[in-house]
């Protein structure tokens, strides 16, 4: 065993302090790094071996702390945290930026006709379903019925919103019409995420004290967690869907895009991608992954149980999800 690296680094937790926005942002910039999708199977397996060996107390000679953390984040980017299975490539967090920039750019380029709206909103919700399935809980996996209901409902909601707003904006400024895809995505998130996590709203999510001791399950905590996720997902989409319309509205009046109109989609995809590189990790970092709420905000029955065992406890903690 090498003396260069201590055996007690907690690689189950993020490298940076998650109680601060900066710490959370650094963590998510690493988690969503698109370069991770280019890693080979050999590189992924090598990272998994480093992580598994370190957890068993086996430290390869010459391994540095930076190399250990790099292996940990490569491992986390490709393998499911509960099952340890390798995740579908497009469902990984590192695929979020390239996949979303392509889909969002196309949604915002081809939004004027009904077939285009139907196709791109369907593609977007299909991608969301893959992401939700890939990142499902290993302890309480989604059933096919739950996944199907959320998928169909979100797709229907997104298409209905987009088509309805397209009809309303036919006689207004073209710039306003460019914001229709964003409204559709926001509506879909408000439908998709609660439906995808409906079991949590029924039976609750685990709540703990600050030391991780489980206190029970709370549906009120689930409501707060899901609300935070919906807000962060909508804000995550906002820069990539709110900034490009202004830029494209100006560019399409210029000689270049008038001469080469086919360049409109690639230019828009590039602008969206630039926005998402920053918006995705920064909006994931808005709320702590380990969220908290006051004991007085819990269900009366759970409050009573907690007061019997931990009369001095004021706050409980829970995993909000992504």
From Swiss-Prot:
Q: Where in the cell is it found?
A: Mitochondrion inner membrane
- Gene Ontology molecular functions: L-alanine transmembrane transporter activity; L-serine transmembrane transporter activity; monoatomic ion transmembrane transporter activity; transmembrane transporter activity
Q: Kindly indicate whether the keyword Membrane belongs to this entry.
A: yes
Reactions catalysed: L-serine(in) = L-serine(out); L-alanine(in) = L-alanine(out); L-cysteine(in) = L-cysteine(out)
Keywords from UniProt, A to Z, are: Acetylation, Amino-acid transport, Membrane, Mitochondrion, Mitochondrion inner membrane, One-carbon metabolism, Transmembrane, Transmembrane helix, Transport
Gene Ontology CC annotation, any one: mitochondrial inner membrane
Give the matching InterPro entries. Mtc
Q: Which domain of life is it from?
A: Eukaryota
Topology feature Mitochondrial intermembrane, residues = 121-146, 196-228, 288-322
Query: What membrane topology is given?
Result: Multi-pass membrane protein
Which ranges of this chain reside in the Mitochondrial matrix compartment per its record?
2-102, 168-174, 250-266
Pfam families assigned to the protein according to its UniProt record, in alphabetical order: SFXNs
Q: Name one GO biological process term.
A: serine import into mitochondrion
PTM sites of type N-acetylserine: 2
According to the UniProt entry, where is the signal peptide?
none
Q: Which residue windows are transmembrane per the record?
A: 103-120, 147-167, 175-195, 229-249, 267-287
What this chain does, per the record? Amino acid transporter importing serine, an essential substrate of the mitochondrial branch of the one-carbon pathway, into mitochondria. Mitochondrial serine is then converted to glycine and formate, which exits to the cytosol where it is used to generate the charged folates that serve as one-carbon donors. May also transport other amino acids including alanine and cysteine.
Q: Which PANTHER family match?
A: SIDEROFLEXIN (PTHR11153), SIDEROFLEXIN-1 (PTHR11153:SF8)
Family membership: Belongs to the sideroflexin family.
- Its protein name is Sideroflexin-1
């Amino acid at each position: 065993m090498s003396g260069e690296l201590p055996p007690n680094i907690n690689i189950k937790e993020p490298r940076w302090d998650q109680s601060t926005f900066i710490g959370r942002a650094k963590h998510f910039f690493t988690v969503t790094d698109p370069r991770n999708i280019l890693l080979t199977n050999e590189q992924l397996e090598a990272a998994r071996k480093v992580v598994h060996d370190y957890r068993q107390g086996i430290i390869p000679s010459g391994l540095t702390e930076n190399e250990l953390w790099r292996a940990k984040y490569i491992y986390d980017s490709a393998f499911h945290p509960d099952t340890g299975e390798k995740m579908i490539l497009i469902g990984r967090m590192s695929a979020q930026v390239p996949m979303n920039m392509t889909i969002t750019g196309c949604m915002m380029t081809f939004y004027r006709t009904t077939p285009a709206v139907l196709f791109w909103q369907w593609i977007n919700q299909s991608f969301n379903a893959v992401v939700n399935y890939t990142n499902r809980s290993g302890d309480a996996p989604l059933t096919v019925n739950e996944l199907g209901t959320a998928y169909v409902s979100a797709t229907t909601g997104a298409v209905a919103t987009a088509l309805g707003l397209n009809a309303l904006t036919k006689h207004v400024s073209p710039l306003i019409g460019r914001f229709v895809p964003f409204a559709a995505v926001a509506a879909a998130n408000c439908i998709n995420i609660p439906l995808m996590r409906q079991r949590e709203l029924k039976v609750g999510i685990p709540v703990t004290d600050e030391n991780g001791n489980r206190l029970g399950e709370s549906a009120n905590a689930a409501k707060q967690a899901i609300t935070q996720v919906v807000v962060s997902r909508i804000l995550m989409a906002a820069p990539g869907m709110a900034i490009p319309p202004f830029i494209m509205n100006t560019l399409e009046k210029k000689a270049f895009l008038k001469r080469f109109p086919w360049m409109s989609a690639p230019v828009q995809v590039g602008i969206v991608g630039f926005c998402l590189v920053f918006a995705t990790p920064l909006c994931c970092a808005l709320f702590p992954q380990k969220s908290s709420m006051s004991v007085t905000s819990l269900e009366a029955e759970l409050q009573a149980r907690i007061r019997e065992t931990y009369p001095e406890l004021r706050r409980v903690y829970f995993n909000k999800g992504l």
